[in-house]
Curated annotation (Swiss-Prot):
Binds 1 zinc ion per subunit. One of its GO terms (cellular component) is cytoplasm. Part of the 30S ribosomal subunit. Contacts proteins S3 and S10. This is Small ribosomal subunit protein uS14B. Belongs to the universal ribosomal protein uS14 family. Zinc-binding uS14 subfamily. Its cofactor is Zn(2+). GO terms for molecular function: rRNA binding; structural constituent of ribosome; zinc ion binding. It comes from the Bacteria.
Length: 61
């Protein structure tokens, strides 16, 4: 889990646009966040396996 101060800092609008960054909405992780879902890869995988993300299925080829 990310520190609350860092989550609040990321939520605030930065002075310059390029300083803004995405964080996982569930755990606050700053890296590897899917913009479409707003989740990091770890949370995305957990929720997909639990069937909590509609329209997401495991691919196989």
């Amino acid at each position: 889990m990310a520190k609350k101060a860092l989550i609040n800092k990321a939520a605030a609008k930065p002075k310059f646009k390029v300083r803004g960054y995405t964080r996982c909405q569930r755990c606050g992780r700053p890296r590897s966040v899917f913009r479409k879902f707003g989740l990091c890869r770890v949370c995305f995988r957990e929720m997909a396996h639990a069937g909590e993300l509609p329209g997401v299925s495991k691919s196989s080829w």
